[in-house]
A protein has these predicted regions:
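Extended recognition patches within non-cytosolic domains
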Residues: 1-4, 95-97, 111-118, 149-214
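Extracellular glycan-interaction patches encoded by glycine-rich segments
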Residues: 125-150
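Short surface loop/edge beta-strand patches of beta-sandwich-type extracellular domains
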Residues: 1-18, 68-78, 140-142, 178-186
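Beta-strand-rich, repetitive solenoid scaffolds
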Residues: 7-9, 38-40, 48-52, 58-62, ...
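Acidic glycine-/aspartate-rich tracts in secreted/extracellular proteins
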Residues: 26-32, 42-43, 63-65, 91-95, ...
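Short tryptophan-centered beta-strand motifs in secreted/extracellular beta-sheet-rich domains
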Residues: 23, 81-92, 103
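Short hydrophobic/aromatic patches on beta-strands that form ligand-binding or substrate-lining surfaces
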Residues: 21-29, 86-88, 137, 150-154, ...
Length: 214
């Protein structure tokens, strides 16, 4: 996907306080800034997940040109041969700030961050809104393209889900493995989607018909 991005403009506004994003990826290049996905109104209002040039990751939300959320890992992600499953589970209504955003890598929650700015309680993030807001998968709006492969990119638009919705631990090897049948605890939500389920198909497999374009 080194020069490719997928794009969708939501037609509905759902909860901007509760959502879960899950995807599987294999990095094709390290030591470079690469955006995996962003939901973007403009440069000062967006939410994104990216790998940094030092191979940490950052999940952040920018509102009115100010950082409302920034989580940058201490851990480095330099394995270009294996797959990572990333699950980002958000519920800003939670009273405890560290429960408002939970990030799991291969089923294990990341708790060590070099930068940790959690969103204020009940904050509406820059996501899940109709109008001029656009989803970009594989880039930061035509820049900082992701170099690698992706599979099973899922968005659950109204609930904070556990990583076990998207993967499970192999009882023999102990490795985190993909669940090919994804069943959210409630539903995908109106803006929810599941793409790249079978090869490179951009057709939404969640029954919502939220299909992406290339």
């Amino acid at each position: 996907m080194a020069n490719t991005q997928l794009q969708l403009s939501p037609t509905n506004t759902n909860s901007r306080q509760k959502f879960t994003v899950s995807f599987w990826l294999k990095r094709g290049k390290i030591n470079s800034e690469q955006c995996v996905w962003t939901t973007r109104l403009d440069s000062g209002n967006n939410t994104l997940f990216k790998f940094n040039a030092n191979d940490t990751f950052t999940f952040k939300c920018n509102k009115s040109n100010a950082d409302a959320l920034v989580l940058t890992s201490n851990a480095l992600f330099r394995d270009a041969s294996g797959w990572y499953n990333v699950v980002i589970a958000v519920d800003t209504t939670q009273s405890t700030d560290t429960n408002r955003v939970k990030i799991y890598i291969n089923g294990v929650q990341e708790t060590s961050f070099g930068t940790a700015t959690y969103p204020s309680q009940n904050l509406s993030l820059e996501i899940n809104e109709s109008g001029n807001q656009v989803w970009y998968i594989g880039s930061e709006s035509s820049q900082n393209y992701f170099d690698g492969s992706m599979s099973y990119f899922a968005f659950v638009s109204e609930t904070q889900e556990a990583p076990t919705v998207f993967g499970s631990t192999d009882s023999t090897t102990g490795e985190w493995q993909i669940k090919t049948s994804i069943t959210p605890s409630v539903a995908f939500g109106t803006n929810g989607f599941l793409i790249l389920k079978d090869g490179s198909s951009l057709t939404d497999q969640s029954s919502n018909s939220n299909n992406f374009s290339l």
